[in-house]
Structures are given as structure tokens and as C-alpha cells.
């Protein structure tokens, strides 16, 4: 992998425990990501512990991802429409949807005109269209050769790159000090005061969140254990999203 264009990002994802080797201690950065691998990594990001019903997913007996798929169902990343697809390479457009489900980036009525520059985006509809527009508008996805390449399989390197463009640090809320270049995914209870942030996500481990004089573009709460959320002071949060599951 040395010298690969995404080497730094892949190493960081490995260090953060999000990306594992693909066998024989190799990262296989140019290999495609399967749906099972994608949701497994996103569940690691969100610290999902709950498990949903996977009976409709047609998971092969003994599949390595059985428990991870159950977590993904619980977190709202998978449903019966994904039946029989978990071992298949995930397309870029379907990956866009997963990133949106995990990070809640698309607004109800996003600016779809940002997709006009990509001729292959005309076939996008519904959630894939909204997710793609949100990722493009935020500068997370830019496409290649003038296209979004929506039907091409997403590689491991591309997955990690999108992930770290969305959020460049995955740390405990207690260790968070303020603004970073991208967003931040925080775990555990939080008591933040007087900090400026771009976008922040509280993962599923947060129970109590207190934000005092906090300024942020977006705050998203993904916790299913939340008992209290207090926002006060003179800060400004442009968008607050409560998405427990």
C-alpha cells in the first residue's frame, strides 16, 4: 500500500479501528467494498451495540458479518430491500445512501442543482439523489472524468476517503477541544462549553449531552441511550438532527 494516493487516510482508518485488513495483513485499497463490509465499518463508527432482526436479509449460515448485519438493521442502515446483497460489491450510489443514513447529511429539500454538472446523475432518484446532492454540495464527493460514476463499485480507499472527509476525528467527547477541518464523531457523554465546530455527531453511546455557548453548522445525535440533551447560552447551531436509530 505504500505510495498509494489514500495511504495516509487508510492508515488513520486502521489506527482508529474502523478499517481492518482484508486478509494476509493487506489493506487491499483498490478492492471493492461489499455491502456487508460497508455497514460493518459504519457500525464501528457509530458504536452500535443493539441488534435488529435479520431474518429477511437471506444471510448465509456462518457468515462472518451476521452480528454486524444485525447491528446495521438496528441502526437503520439495512432493511429487507438489501436481502441477498450483502456479499455483493456496493455501488457508489448505494454507498452514498449508506453514508446519508449513518451521518444524516441530506436535508429534506437539498439543492439538487449541484448534480447538473454530472450527466450520469440524471438517473438518480429519491434518497440516492438527495444523498449524492448533499455529498457534492459539502465537497465530500467530486466525481471523476466529469461524472459521479454512480454505478461503479466503491473501493476501500474511496470508502475511507469519503468517511474522513465527513469526519476527520473519532474520539471520546471528553477529549474533544473544538473546531477541526472536517466533522467529528464523539462517543460517550458530553459537556461542551464555548467551542466552535463544523459538524458533529454523537454516536450511539451518549446518554447525557450538554452544549453551552456552542456554535456549530450541524449537530446530529445518533444515540439510542439518550436521557438528557441541554442546549443553552449564546452559541448558534444551524441544524440539529435527532436520529436515534
Feature-to-residue mapping (PLM):
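Short, T/G/N/S-enriched strand-turn elements that build extracellular solenoid repeat scaffolds
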Residues: 173-178, 183-245
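Flexible glycan-contacting loops in extracellular carbohydrate-active proteins
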Residues: 132
Amino acid at each position: 500500500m505504500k505510495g498509494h494516493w489514500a495511504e495516509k487516510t487508510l492508515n488513520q482508518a486502521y489506527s482508529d479501528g474502523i478499517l481492518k485488513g482484508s486478509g494476509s495483513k493487506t489493506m487491499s485499497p483498490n478492492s471493492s467494498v461489499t455491502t456487508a463490509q460497508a455497514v460493518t465499518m459504519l457500525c464501528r463508527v457509530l458504536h452500535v451495540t443493539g441488534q435488529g432482526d435479520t431474518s429477511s436479509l437471506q444471510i448465509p449460515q456462518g457468515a462472518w458479518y451476521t452480528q454486524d448485519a444485525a447491528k446495521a438493521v438496528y441502526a437503520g442502515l439495512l432493511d429487507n430491500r438489501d436481502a441477498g446483497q450483502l456479499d455483493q460489491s456496493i455501488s457508489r450510489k448505494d454507498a452514498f445512501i449508506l453514508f446519508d443514513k449513518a451521518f444524516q447529511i441530506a436535508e429534506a429539500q437539498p439543492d439538487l442543482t449541484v448534480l447538473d454538472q454530472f450527466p450520469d446523475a440524471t438517473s438518480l432518484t429519491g434518497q440516492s439523489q438527495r444523498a449524492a446532492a448533499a455529498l457534492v454540495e459539502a465537497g465530500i464527493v467530486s466525481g471523476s472524468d466529469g461524472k459521479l460514476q454512480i454505478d461503479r463499485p466503491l473501493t476501500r480507499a474511496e470508502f475511507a476517503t469519503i468517511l474522513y472527509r465527513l469526519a476527520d476525528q473519532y474520539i471520546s467527547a471528553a477529549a474533544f477541544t473544538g473546531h477541526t477541518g472536517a466533522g467529528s464523531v464523539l462517543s460517550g457523554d458530553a459537556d461542551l462549553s464555548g467551542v466552535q465546530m463544523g459538524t458533529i455527531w454523537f454516536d450511539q453511546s451518549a446518554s447525557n449531552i450538554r452544549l453551552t455557548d456552542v456554535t456549530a453548522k450541524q449537530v446530529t445525535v445518533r444515540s439510542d441511550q439518550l436521557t438528557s440533551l441541554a442546549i443553552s447560552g449564546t452559541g448558534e447551531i444551524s441544524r440539529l438532527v435527532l436520529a436515534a436509530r
